[in-house]
């Protein structure tokens, strides 16, 4: 069933991944740098020191360049849902569209309104009003992130909705359940705090570059003082929310957790692999999954279920089942899901033929207010999405990509905590400028921060595969039935456009950094 649209699905996935990766190159800096600029402007308003005005305008200029390119790259993403993922849009558009609409109407207008005051309001409005505009721009950008992350979190953990048999759509039943789900709340805080860390590293890295060249040393030291403290605090918060993410994933997406750890066979007191080299063939042939590994005993069980002796299901348990621990095999879920898919097909046929007896019979099965309906929904429709798979092995994501991406993200996060703490401490004691090795490390930490941020999204999105909506809709079913050639052409057009935008951003940013702060 899915093979008919395989090439279209692949091109659609590649296009969305490419545009999302490019867009996310700009978003985290916007989320964090806005608050750093607001802090610096607050210091200017409180002290009336022209130094802080000059410093604020410099970082604000870099913020504006990044913001503009970020908006341009983000517009295309929402249109892709209608063009490449029309089945998805029909099936859950009522739910998924709501937070995106709120983001566009409320949050984006907030930031786009006040950013005009922020950039063009100097000497035209009072200092207090301008400062308020700067803070509201930063809050508006993060409010936009909230609603977008709510939509993404619903794809990971679909709640607050009910299936409407007549329209064959999932419809929202509780907005608060969607907007305030534990996945959405934790994902928001983990994403924005990690973005704050990236922005802090950007400011520290650029300032370190100035110190290496013995330029703008006062601005560099004071910028580092603010950014390193800001980044260190939020790096710790990111670690905390990351730990919470692991516990949530263990509960709602166990296959993602098993793939992240390359855990093929579940076990009690499962260890966490700190470092390891995978045997790629292990996914096909079995046997030891690693050439080499360093484990932390029982840590995976402790982090996932807050018990050192808890059972963590592995990939094989989730695919083939584990009767001892009550893990249902994927083959049974597929069979149950096919019953639901077949009933929907029967319902469609019955409506076309006007078969009222069949319509009444099937509607009773989907009526959760009756014992028969509640049982059918629990025993069969709960596994609806599985009905589109032909084999249990199809539910396994790319283990190697997840395993290494997760370790890049976590390893970089731990490194950033140490780096920012050390930079703050040495800068406070006026010893940072003499540590040229550390300044170079700070400069090179900037691209590492972007790599870690992208790796985090790889873990989140690749780990959900093969689902567009966890347990409800596979990616292959979500795609539009359009020629693959159409998608491939737009893929390369967008690739060229986004590459040009990235090149323009880097060129302008590097030129502005090289020029440095400007005197009024």
Each model region followed by its residue ranges:
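Polytopic transmembrane helical bundles with strong interfacial aromatic enrichment
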Residues: 1-520
